[in-house]
Amino acid sequence: AAPAGSRAGEMDLTALLQNPLVENSNVHFNAKDVYNFQLEKTPDMRILMKKFKKSFDSAEPKPSTVTLDVGNTDRAFGTIIGSEITARFGNTLPDDAFIPKGLTLELVGDANDYIGKGLSGGKLVVYPPKDAAFDRSENIVIGNVALYGATGGTAFINGVAGERFCVRNSGATAVVEGVGDHGCEYMTGGTVVVLGKTGKNFAAGMSGGIAYVLDEDWDFYQRVNKDMVSLEPVEHKYDVSLLKDLIREHVELTGSPRGKEILDNFGEYLPKFKKVLP
């Protein structure tokens, strides 16, 4: 209770302490009125959970693969199966929005905002159909805020990402062929390779991790936020090896023509990369 005569005693907390059902209103709280998300209709429950049941029940799970069509209404695809893996095995599965270690999602096509949100150890691979007529390195294939809050794992994107790519990334490794505004914003860890142009305000609030950005037009300095980072050439043996290995894996997984061009002429492209370091 508030002391007598204090201003705190004059506060009315009724609105916080009571949850009245407002008549003729859709805004209310009732513990018994739980929203039905119809999870049983999701691809995770209809297909993935059934497909991998034997692996889940096995003392020594073996790798399994499933191919299926997903659409833009299949939200949070892979989240339920990822949760099941974490609940059953923790982080003990062999190497390979919340993809844990042991789960690989390979998407042929494009994706909406928030793909890879909370990536926590798994692998995410995105590329357009092999017969796509457009230049992958010049077209957006994933939406905004991809890999938001990722803590681990890898992502290889054969195309351009929207805004705020890898915002709050704290441990994931990603390769992409271009990003919109505010890339690597508030990043605290992990590694990002950008094989193309960035939007403005790159690395704003970036306090950890490393980014390697291809700066073919020598104008990246105009789009990076220099408040907390510095730009350096990629010269150290470790950086050169890491950069080349990530581009090579990107090409192997996505078939990226852009990545292959850079690998085939690595000596020519290396001086054009900038290392972004907090």
Where are these regions (language model features)?
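Long, distal/terminal scaffolding or interaction modules
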Residues: 5-277
